């Protein structure tokens, strides 16, 4: 017994140190412990180790196979931990926890250890299937034996608040200590607080717990606990980590599904959410990778449209304060532009004639894009933008005559630059798209404007584009 007590003491000491160092020192111990536990299971005599899984004792097995295990799995920067060591630890800790799962459930229920239950539910969102399945089994078993409403009350009134609570020390004069620091130190601390908020070190997977809380609510009960849930959702939505932001958007979508629209308008939360989501259009390279930016912008757009599905004022905001930011700051990123124009097609479908005030801006941007050498050298991307231009001109064909000069000039430049590149991929489709656009313009301009069309014909003859 003394041997196990000494190990328990050492493991508790290691938990306060660097994760990687602690893991390396625990691997050998866990190997020996797994072998010993397996032998005890085989002999059907777990009594020598039972006292060490009790939360009232040394938290020995809980400390090794659960608490530290959970800290590792919910670590905000998993890349900082060696993957091989991490997997080795997880497998061994999982084995121990699996063997003692009945005693674990019994002790958590007996001690009403809500925090452990909260973290187990959070782990349902982890990628590791082994861990996720065990966590779901344990949390389901514990929930069936404890008062669910009391647990929900604990999560709403204590756990969330403590997790997101900001500890701010004050000077004798009542001013925050941070403001008394030298400027360099102040900015350093503030930056670290924004990038690495303390809640991430406590439960990096908190959003999955909030998913669970929301799923337990009805349209009436969500209104009662609204003031407890929405601050946490907004904290997650406004986090600087892209992955956390995406979870925040999903949380907003869950709330929108069960909350009455009148209640959202009454509380003013719709406008707050709209403003927060529009900021996503500024998350472009080099701050984020191109793919991350596209993912954030697309997710934000889908939620923004659902906020005010029938109101043009909201759709106007998406165009002016959202997509317009992409035009201004992401012109050199074709994938982001593709996402923006895909969204524009959705807006034109919803707004119809109400989109006309933005048609000139949209056509000007498209003309710039199809003349961009960077775009022309990517046939699939060029084909996409030519298709978008064709669809827009078909929808608003009665406005072609007002823009025919800019359109013809852009198409001539695009055609000449494309033919010079001598690209074979999508060649027939691109030539056909250019031909269709010239024809579409010709059919929708006045007799007087046909003179402008005829002027460009000699420029196209060497390009072998049939008109």
Curated annotation (Swiss-Prot):
The UniProt record lists the keyword Membrane: no
Keywords: Chromatin regulator, Coiled coil, Nucleus
GO biological-process terms attached to the record: 'de novo' cotranslational protein folding; chromatin organization
GO molecular function annotation: protein-macromolecule adaptor activity
Segments forming a coiled coil: 4-45
Pfam families: Tti2 (PF10521)
Cellular component, GO, one term: cytosol
Record InterPro entries: Tti2 (IPR018870)
Subcellular location: Nucleus
Predominant cellular place of this UniProt entry's protein: nucleus
Keyword Nucleus among UniProt keywords: yes
UniProt xrefs under PANTHER family: TELO2-INTERACTING PROTEIN 2
Family: Belongs to the TTI2 family.
Role, per record: Component of the tel2-tti1-tti2 (TTT) complex that stabilizes protein levels of the phosphatidylinositol 3-kinase-related protein kinase (PIKK) family proteins. The TTT complex is involved in the cellular resistance to DNA damage stresses, like ionizing radiation (IR), ultraviolet (UV) and mitomycin C (MMC). Component of the ASTRA complex involved in chromatin remodeling.
Oligomeric form and interacting partners: Component of the TTT complex composed of tel2, tti1 and tti2. Interacts with tel2 and ttiI1. Component of the ASTRA complex composed of at least rvb1, rvb2, tra1, tel2, tti1 and tti2.
Protein name as annotated: Tel2-interacting protein 2
Organism: Schizosaccharomyces pombe (strain 972 / ATCC 24843)
């Amino acid at each position: 017994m003394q041997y196990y007590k000494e190990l328990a003491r050492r493991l508790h000491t290691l938990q306060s140190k660097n994760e990687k160092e602690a893991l390396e020192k625990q691997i050998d111990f866990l190997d020996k412990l797994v072998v010993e536990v397996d032998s005890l299971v085989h002999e059907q005599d777990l009594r020598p180790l039972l006292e060490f899984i009790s939360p009232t004792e040394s938290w020995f097995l809980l400390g090794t196979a659960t608490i530290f295990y959970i800290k590792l799995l919910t670590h905000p920067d998993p890349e900082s931990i060696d993957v091989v060591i991490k997997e080795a630890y997880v497998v061994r800790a999982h084995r121990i926890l699996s063997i003692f799962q009945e005693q674990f459930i019994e002790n958590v229920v007996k001690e009403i250890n809500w925090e452990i239950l909260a973290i187990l539910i959070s782990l349902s969102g982890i990628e590791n299937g082994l861990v996720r399945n065990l966590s779901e089994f344990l949390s389901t078993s514990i929930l069936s034996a404890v008062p669910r409403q009391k647990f929900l009350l604990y999560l709403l009134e204590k756990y969330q608040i403590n997790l997101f609570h900001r500890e701010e020390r004050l000077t004798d004069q009542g001013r925050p200590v941070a403001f008394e620091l030298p400027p360099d130190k102040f900015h350093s601390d503030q930056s670290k607080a924004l990038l690495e908020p303390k809640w991430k070190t406590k439960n990096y997977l908190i959003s999955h717990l909030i998913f669970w809380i929301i799923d337990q609510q009805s349209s009436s009960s969500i209104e009662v606990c609204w003031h407890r849930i929405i601050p946490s959702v907004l904290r997650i939505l406004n986090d600087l980590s892209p992955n956390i932001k995406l979870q925040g958007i999903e949380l907003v979508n869950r709330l929108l599904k069960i909350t009455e629209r009148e209640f959202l308008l009454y509380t003013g939360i719709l406008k707050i959410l709209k403003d927060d989501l529009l900021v996503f259009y500024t998350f472009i390279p080099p701050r984020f990778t191109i793919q991350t930016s596209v993912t954030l912008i697309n997710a934000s757009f889908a939620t923004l449209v659902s906020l005010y599905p029938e109101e043009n004022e909201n759709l106007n905001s998406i165009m002016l304060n959202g997509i317009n930011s992409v035009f201004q700051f992401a012109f050199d990123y074709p994938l982001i532009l593709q996402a923006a124009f895909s969204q524009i097609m959705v807006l034109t479908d919803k707004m119809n004639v109400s989109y006309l005030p933005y048609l000139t801006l949209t056509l000007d941007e498209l003309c710039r894009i199809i003349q961009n050498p960077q775009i022309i050298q990517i046939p699939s991307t060029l084909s996409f933008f030519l298709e978008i231009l064709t669809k827009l001109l078909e929808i608003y064909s009665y406005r072609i005559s007002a823009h025919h000069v800019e359109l013809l000039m852009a198409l001539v430049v695009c055609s000449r630059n494309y033919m010079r590149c001598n690209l074979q991929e999508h060649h027939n489709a691109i030539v056909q798209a250019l031909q269709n656009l010239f024809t579409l313009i010709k059919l929708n301009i006045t007799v007087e404007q046909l003179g402008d069309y005829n002027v460009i014909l000699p420029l196209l003859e060497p390009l072998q584009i049939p008109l």
